[in-house]
Amino acid sequence: MAPFLKLGALLVGNLEAMSYGTSLTLFDPYIVNGQRVFMDTCWLPALDSAGIDVFVEAMDTAASAQCAVFTHEFKGAASRVPAHATAFGLRCDHVLVEILATLFDRSNKKEEQRHRQWARATRQAFSPIALPGGYPNFLVAEDADRVAKSYGANAERLIAAKRRYDPDNVFRSANPLPGVNAGLP
């Protein structure tokens, strides 16, 4: 955190231990029905100086004050569980980068495009230092290559389970699987 704290005056900040359930409620005040949110994601092997430079540049060029870049560290148990034991394919220490561009006025197509482009450009700026794929919860089926890389060797096993337990693709709005879009392959 030290490099971030040297960037300037901290407007809002809190570092403390909390339960997982409590952490899930932290952003509730900012999740408002009717707003438009563009999301993107990538994984970094670590948050080093190159990643911090991209982070700072992204926020310097943010489309609005409602844009944000969050990081979540995956370490400890998240990297000790064997990849074949769960659906989650990346089982090494890494940092999840979550990119959000929020727009309250859904009628302004120019601003919508500007926010969408900022999210995309931010992820692309991380690309040279990013790991393949991204956090599956934040990916869309149209990004098939990144979806496939996110699940790694688990993809085929997950697709087989999907075919078996959801042959009618009832849960099609859930996390995308490689090759599973509107219908099953």
Whereabouts are the PLM-identified features?
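Soluble FAD-dependent oxygen oxidases
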Residues: 1-185
